């Protein structure tokens, strides 16, 4: 054995590594303690820079030590000559780059570099752009570096066209680049500002067509990559609806005025103010939500004094002015009438299709044909299927209703993990279609039975509905937003899976509630119905609570004003 090199056993190697780690830890802790002691004593000199360099060079994410470094550099700024300071800054930039090589996603390092360059009289921004390009070449999804690049581009006033060309180069190299696609969505509206395009920034048609060609190349190259599909969704546009008062309703019986808005707002929050004019005279009122909660809502209402509802006059005019939205609506309550209202005769574009809004329907039609072509090649691509559905919704939701439902079935089979989400999205679209049909027919009755609904949306659109049929669906609860249905008189929800009635509250006109064959377990779940003053008929047949002993007596005690309770 003599003359041969001894080979360490695995146990010896592990022990040696343990001792090495312990030694490094002792040095690390000693250096850290020394830095803190010097900082506490106010000894902010170059020795602190040296000590923190040793620690941060190994662990760039020690935020407190970056703070110490900044304190030292601020101290040295007033002590050093310009030449010495330039040498110090050059060394600091080099040290920061070495830290980024250790951890390219170090928050503290990137922040410190921003801080340092912001204090320089003439920073070399071209060098910083080159540094970003180098690090993005290593990892094009490093969002820390992308944030820093946007900072540098803003400070250096880099033209958006140059930055767009930079994203071109990265996307050409690798289509799967979320950050590059996102940066394009920020740059294009700057390059091509459109009047009245809103905060989302709509693009001119020629630019849009060019971008659509680019993104089509991406998802035809790799149909399963999500980044291009998300950018495609942005290109189609998501315009915000215009601020508007959708509906104004006055009830003489309830001595109440109700307003429906195009978006949720918080009245009395300083920004959102409602002014009520009755017969051209301002009336001070207290605004509240139907649920009585102080939070943003589509629906706001107020109580009216008896003088504003005097039936001796031929009519009363009510006008609500929304100051933040610069919108108003007026309705008339005629003598002898119990209610009056005014609502928008909204088209589908105004109500729902603003979510996908491209000026030219030919562009949408072309996109739909391209996606269908891709779907033939990739029949199980979920992104393609979802995009086809959204394009059909954008083009004509009623014309494509049947075809859309077929695509939903295919999509659920392809992507069963998101079946619940797809069921809810399908329910949302079906409810939108039903609301559109009701609007066109100008009726106050809405039939949503046998549609396999799993969720209720857009209830703020149903302020004037008097009869609502939700029978034979898959609803598990009636949502609090149901309180928006201030005119509702009859609610049918047979044959669902309803377990809770928390949403059936404060419905001033509700007279009949049909809940046969649901999953109501205990009489206590009916407590919310005590807030519905006109409820006279309640049908609970086929619910588990009907099997409990003494349930009829308990229900009669809980709801004494309900004259007919069927169990």
UniProtKB/Swiss-Prot annotation:
EC category name: transferase
Domain of life according to the entry: Eukaryota
Q: Which organism is it from?
A: Bos taurus
Q: What InterPro entries would the database entry show?
A: LRR_dom_sf (IPR032675), Prenyl_trans_a (IPR002088), RabGGT_asu_insert-dom_sf (IPR036254), RabGGT_asu_insert-domain (IPR009087)
Record-level GO BP terms: endoplasmic reticulum to Golgi vesicle-mediated transport; protein geranylgeranylation
Q: Does the keyword Protein biosynthesis apply?
A: no
Gene (name only): RABGGTA
Q: How is its activity regulated?
A: The enzymatic reaction requires the aid of a Rab escort protein (also called component A), such as CHM.
Output the Gene Ontology cellular-component terms.
cytoplasm; Rab-protein geranylgeranyltransferase complex
* PANTHER family to which the protein is assigned, alphabetical: GERANYLGERANYL TRANSFERASE TYPE-2 SUBUNIT ALPHA, PROTEIN FARNESYLTRANSFERASE ALPHA SUBUNIT/RAB GERANYLGERANYL TRANSFERASE ALPHA SUBUNIT
User: PFTA repeat boundaries?
Assistant: 44-78, 88-122, 124-158, 159-193, 207-241, 363-397
Question: Which family does the record assign?
Answer: Belongs to the protein prenyltransferase subunit alpha family.
Q: Which UniProt keywords apply?
A: Leucine-rich repeat, Phosphoprotein, Prenyltransferase, Repeat, Transferase
> PTM Phosphoserine: at which residues?
98
Q: What is the protein's quaternary organization?
A: Heterotrimer composed of RABGGTA, RABGGTB and CHM; within this trimer, RABGGTA and RABGGTB form the catalytic component B, while CHM (component A) mediates peptide substrate binding. The Rab GGTase dimer (RGGT) interacts with CHM (component A) prior to Rab protein binding; the association is stabilized by geranylgeranyl pyrophosphate (GGpp). The CHM:RGGT:Rab complex is destabilized by GGpp. Interacts with non-phosphorylated form of RAB8A; phosphorylation of RAB8A at 'Thr-72' disrupts this interaction.
Repeat (LRR) positions are 442-463, 464-486, 487-508, 509-530, 534-555
Q: Which reaction does it catalyse?
A: geranylgeranyl diphosphate + L-cysteinyl-[protein] = S-geranylgeranyl-L-cysteinyl-[protein] + diphosphate
Q: By what name is this protein known?
A: Geranylgeranyl transferase type-2 subunit alpha
Report the GO molecular function annotations. Answer: Rab geranylgeranyltransferase activity; small GTPase binding; zinc ion binding
Task: Report the protein's function.
Answer: Catalyzes the transfer of a geranylgeranyl moiety from geranylgeranyl diphosphate to both cysteines of Rab proteins with the C-terminal sequence -XXCC, -XCXC and -CCXX, such as RAB1A, RAB3A, RAB5A and RAB7A.
């Amino acid at each position: 054995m003599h003359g041969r090199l001894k080979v360490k056993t695995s146990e010896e190697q592990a022990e040696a590594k343990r001792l090495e780690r312990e030694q490094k830890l002792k040095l690390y802790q000693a250096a850290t303690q020394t830095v803190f002691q010097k900082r506490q004593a106010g000894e902010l000199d170059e020795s602190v820079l040296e000590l923190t360099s040793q620690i941060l060079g190994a662990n760039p994410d020690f935020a407190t030590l970056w703070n110490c470094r900044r304190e030292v550099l601020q101290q040295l700024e007033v002590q050093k000559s310009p030449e010495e300071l330039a040498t110090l800054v050059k060394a600091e930039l080099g040290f920061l780059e070495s830290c980024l090589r250790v951890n390219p996603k170090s928050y503290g390092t990137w922040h410190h570099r921003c801080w340092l360059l912001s204090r320089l009289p003439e920073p070399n921004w071209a060098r910083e752009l080159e540094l970003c390009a180098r690090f993005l070449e290593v990892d094009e999804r490093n969002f820390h570096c992308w944030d820093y690049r946007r900072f540098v581009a803003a400070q250096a006033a880099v033209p958006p066209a140059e930055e767009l060309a930079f994203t071109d180069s990265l996307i050409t190299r690798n289509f799967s680049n979320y950050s590059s696609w996102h940066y394009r969505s920020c740059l294009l509206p700057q390059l091509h500002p459109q009047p009245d395009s809103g905060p989302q920034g709509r693009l001119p048609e020629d630019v849009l067509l060019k971008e659509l060609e680019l993104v089509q190349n991406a998802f035809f190259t790799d149909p399963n990559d999500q980044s291009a599909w998300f950018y495609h969704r942005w290109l189609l546009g998501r315009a915000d609806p215009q601020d508007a008062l959708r509906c104004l309703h006055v009830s003489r019986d309830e001595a109440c005025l109700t307003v429906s808005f195009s978006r949720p707002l918080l009245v009395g929050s300083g920004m959102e103010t409602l002014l009520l004019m009755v017969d051209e005279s301002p009336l001070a009122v207290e605004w509240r939500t139907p649920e009585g909660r102080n939070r943003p809502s589509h629906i706001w209402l107020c109580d009216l004094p008896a003088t504003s509802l005097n039936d001796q006059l031929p009519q009363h005019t009510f006008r609500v002015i929304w100051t933040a939205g610069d919108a108003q609506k007026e309705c008339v309550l005629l003598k002898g009438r119990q209610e009056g209202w005014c609502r928008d005769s909204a088209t589908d574009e105004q109500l729902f299709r603003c979510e996908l809004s491209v000026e030219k329907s030919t562009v949408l039609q072309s996109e739909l044909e391209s996606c269908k072509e891709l779907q033939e090649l990739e029949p199980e691509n979920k992104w393609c299927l979802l995009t086809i559905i959204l394009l059909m919704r954008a083009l004509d939701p009623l014309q494509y209703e049947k075809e859309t439902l077929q695509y939903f079935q295919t999509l659920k089979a392809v992507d069963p993990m998101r079946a619940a989400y797809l069921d809810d999205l399908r329910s949302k679209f079906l409810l939108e279609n039903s609301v559109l049909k009701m609007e066109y027919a100008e009726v106050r009755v809405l039939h949503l039975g046998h549609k396999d609904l799993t969720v209720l949306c857009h209830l703020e659109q149903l302020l004037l509905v008097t009869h609502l049929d939700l029978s034979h669906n898959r609803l598990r609860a009636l949502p609090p937003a149901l309180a928006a249905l201030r005119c509702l008189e009859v609610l049918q929800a047979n044959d669902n899976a309803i377990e809770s009635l928390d949403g059936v509250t404060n419905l001033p006109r509700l007279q009949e509630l049909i809940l046969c064959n649901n999953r109501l377990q205990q009489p206590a779940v009916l407590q919310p119905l005590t807030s519905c003053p006109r409820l006279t008929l309640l049908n609970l047949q086929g619910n588990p609570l009907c099997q409990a002993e003494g349930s009829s007596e308990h229900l009669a005690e809980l709801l004494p004003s309900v004259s007919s309770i069927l169990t």
